[in-house]
Amino acid sequence: MSETFPETNTPVQTPSTESFVNKMNAGDKTIGNNIFSQDSDSNQQSSHQEPLSPPNPSPTPEKRQLDDEVDNSIEPESKKQKVEEETEASQTGVIQTEVSETVPEIESSVNKDSEPVNGVSEESENTNNEQEKPQEEAPEENPQEEVPEAKPQEEASGENPQEIPNDKPQDDEPDIQEVDPPKPVVPVFTEPAPKPPQEPDMNNLPENPIPQHQAKFVLNTIKAVKRNREAVPFLHPVDTVKLNVPFYYNYIPRPMDLSTIERKINLKAYEDVSQVVDDFNLMVKNCKKFNGEAAGISKMATNIQAQFEKLMVKVPPKELPAGTNVAEATSVATSPTTNKRKSVAESSSSHQHRDSVAAARPKRTIHPPKSKELPYETKPKNKKVAAELRFCNQTIKELMSKKHYNYNFPFLAPVDTVALNIPNYNEIVKQPMDLGTIQSKLANNEYENADDFEKDVRLVFKNCYLFNPEGTDVNMMGHRLEAVFDKKWANKPVPEPTPQNSDVSDREYSSEEEDNVEISEAMLSEIPAIQVMENQIIRMRKELDELKKEHLKKLREQQAARKKKKQQKGKRRAPKAKHTKDTQHQVQAPPEPPKLTPPQPVVTYEMKKQVSEMVPNLSDKKLNALIKIIQDDVQISNDDEVELDMDQLEDRTVLKLYDFLFGDKALKNSAGKKKKPVANNNLDELAHLRSQLALFDEGVNGQQGSDNGFMKVVNQEESSEDEASSESSEEE
């Protein structure tokens, strides 16, 4: 009898391929031995396990025995249980028949070939274990049909069964081997695509475009987005030549930009507001598709998209409610960034609510508005405050000048939290401030003094350092601009001590504002400049009257003296020689008229102008002498700096200054010339007086007759002098 082999799960060493092939080709004897060994194994295992599968109905018993051998060694335990009930009866009969037919033939060779049979059986078992892997990969529905195919394939190929690993099942291989996902195929373009046609298509404009109020709102929204700094790359279509992107249209078949959207709105190419939103989103999508999500320009596109969506929330409806004018809707839509009114749909209900509340409240007194012709602040500021505010105006212009633009541009306008994408700015900075706001407050006279101005400027830099930490660009710009401000503010003029009268005048002006006193001519006379001019006019008129009286009196006296001399000459026609000489001397040297006191000259505007223009050109020596002249009449507190105001100086002081500056020239001009006769001097004085009288219309019109009489007297005087000179020549 054949030896029984205990059933174990330990792996058996697989023989080499050459030994396996030689034994398979050894003949019927070797096959019989294999069949016997397989039958003995199956009989030994029948006590433990039931038959697994029915025999393969092959035409030859040798083939059928090999199939049974393969089935017993390859079939897994799970598959054996499935087909146990179906094949139990048929398999048992077939196996018994095969054993009864083969036992007489192989009984004699059992003892001889016991060792080879074991070896073959071991080889067959190992071979079957190796064939178990490809069979497990096959579907479970037909396990019997694939068993005979596995053996011939293995025999034909002659592969070494050791190459297939036995320690791990083949079903786990897909879990171990991880396959990378397929990468997207990047298209390779050889030729650039043509430029798409320009939008909109003028031949396919919609019949029912969006209404006018919606179009105006959307247009203003696009303009507001275009004013954003981050919208610069999206203002115009992409220039593929300038930007060196020839394959742009291969990736972007339908380009879009803000100017195209604006042109389509103006040409009424949109039927609904949603189409405008789609075009804007297409522009942002094209940017991210061509440049990538992480690019800087893609982030800029995201920021302007957020601003656009925030503004489009307030878009008016397509059909306005009844009783709403188009002008009201457009007024709401004209300024979407600064509009704070409620929507038009809520206007009717809000008006009703206000009317009901107004009826329940007590009526208040209505005060008339202030006159638009007068400024908001009629109180004149004193010189100290005015000088400080002038310096503040110069300082703000210096801070906002273009030469500091590299580091002052973040502070020129209020911070736009939407455009800069900093929604938490107002939470950190409680009191925002900028240079533009400071300049407008200066223009509106909202600062009382320079300290308030400095406080706001310091607030700008404080907010900058609070929101931007050290080391950031904006923080460094703030430090540079603050250094410019400190340098400029160090040159602020020192305020002069103000007298107590200024406080009294301020109180008077404040009381006048409270009482709303009307302005009259009497109030104008209180202005110092007008008072000075009025006093000068009165004084000049008095001086003119006195001068006229004096000159007329003197001329009449001279005329009377000449008449007496003529009468005396007529009585003395035959005198002696000595007497004639005496008379000749008397005629040649007529008695000098009494010396006239020169009239006090009148201070004119031209004289003041000449003095003021001459002062800057003086040397230090003359300037010191001029200051002494001023100090004689006016008390000056500060010796280092003298403010020369010609209107505040008295006339005598102005005359002294004029004589000091221009007196030498007059003497030099008169030294080289002969003395004019008294009549010519009088004529010059009269001409000067006439020029002064021309400045006053009233004096000229009222005293025209007296001037004519005065000229007649002068002419008579000239004729008498000529007669006297002719008589003296005849006597000689």
Swiss-Prot record:
It is found in: Nucleus. The keyword Manganese does not apply. One of its GO terms (molecular function) is lysine-acetylated histone binding. Pfam families: BET, Bromodomain. Residues 1-22, 89-100, 327-338 have a biased composition (Polar residues). Residues 37-51 have a biased composition (Low complexity). One of its GO terms (biological process) is chromatin remodeling. SMART domains: BROMO. Residues 529-569 form a coiled coil. Residues 561-579 have a biased composition (Basic residues). GO terms for cellular component: chromatin; nucleus. Transmembrane segments: none annotated. This is Bromodomain-containing factor 1. It comes from Candida albicans (strain SC5314 / ATCC MYA-2876) (Yeast).
